[in-house]
A protein has these predicted regions:
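Active-site-proximal loop/helix segment associated with metal-binding centers of metalloenzymes
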Residues: 129-131, 141, 153-205
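Active-site metal-binding motif and surrounding structural segment of the metallo-beta-lactamase
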Residues: 70-120, 227-236
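N-terminal amphipathic/basic-hydrophobic helices that include classical n-h-c signal peptides
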Residues: 1-28
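Glycine-rich phosphate-binding "P-loop"
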Residues: 28-42, 179-190, 239-245
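Metal-dependent catalytic neighborhoods of phosphoester/phosphodiester hydrolases
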Residues: 99-108, 132-133, 247-253
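Conserved beta-strand hairpin/beta-sheet module of binuclear metal-dependent hydrolase folds
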Residues: 30-77, 192, 196-211
């Protein structure tokens, strides 16, 4: 896979990876640039969160906005135009991926923002006896209702770009294990991550999955996409795997599960 390094800042901060995508004109690149993650380097700032700028077949797609306006500031330094984004996608309803949605809407006056239908202001993490709110910025769903599109089931944004929900049963047990909850009808229930979705691109090498946290399990997500497109190869998965709080044994098990899927590229 070729690697494009555009300047010293990008070289230090990230590697922009190109996966060729076939169209009538031959092969055009898909370029994914990390705008924000938890690593700061040089002029680029970092924070607990993620935002990825994806260029595909002449369209610009933003995945998540991170936890502050740093995604937009880094985008300017990386010469990526937030104003030129055609479509925005929210991976899941947690603050570190959504808190700067308002910043995006203020900078971009036209792109729809795709959220899974399960996204509400109701995500919490439990520590001891306390439930801490970790969800969407308050009132974002009403303040920008005209810019938000809710997705249900398998959803095609444009040809070759898809949003895929979880299809693995009983994911509420993941919520139980991770002490993540949703509040519904004045009661606490384990989060089943019905608000999480995968952003999938069809490329010449195969399907490429972007999932910012993989709360539902990275191997589950690979298998979900594979089952959705049974005649196509799942080539790669890019994003966050939420392994920072896992034991060495748990991480080894996840690595083996990923290997068992037969996927070629992991980032």
């Amino acid at each position: 896979m070729p690697i494009q390094l555009t300047n010293d800042i990008i070289i230090k901060k990230l590697v922009s990876r190109i996966i060729t995508n076939k169209n009538k004109g031959g092969y055009t690149p898909m370029l994914a640039t990390i705008l924000i993650d938890n690593i700061a380097c040089g002029e680029l700032k970092g924070e607990w969160g993620l935002s990825i700028y994806i260029e595909y077949n002449g369209k610009n797609i933003l995945l998540d906005t991170g936890a502050s306006d740093l995604f937009a500031k880094n985008a300017q330094k990386l010469e990526k135009s937030i104003e030129s984004v055609d479509y925005a996608v929210l991976s899941h309803a947690h603050y570190d991926h959504s808190d700067s949605m308002a910043t995006f809407f203020n900078l971009n006056d036209h792109a729809p923002f795709f959220l899974r239908e399960g996204c509400q202001e109701n995500c919490y993490a439990k520590k001891w006896i306390f439930h801490k709110y970790i969800g969407l910025p308050k009132h974002i769903l009403t303040d920008y209702r005209d810019r938000i599109i809710y997705t249900d089931g398998d959803y095609e944004i444009i040809p070759g770009v898809y949003l895929i929900p979880h299809k693995t049963p009983n994911l509420k047990m993941v919520g139980k294990r991770e002490s993540m909850y949703r509040k519904e009808h004045h009661r606490w229930i384990y989060d089943d991550f019905s608000h999480e979705q995968s952003l999938v691109f069809r490329t010449q090498k195969g399907l490429v999955i972007f999932n910012s946290c993989c709360h539902g399990g990275v191997a589950n997500i690979i298998n979900e996409v594979g089952a959705t497109f049974p005649t196509e190869k799942v080539y790669g998965i890019i994003g966050g795997f939420h392994l920072f709080n896992k034991s060495e044994e748990e991480i080894k098990n996840v690595i083996q599960q990923i290997k068992d899927t037969g996927i070629h590229y992991v980032c």
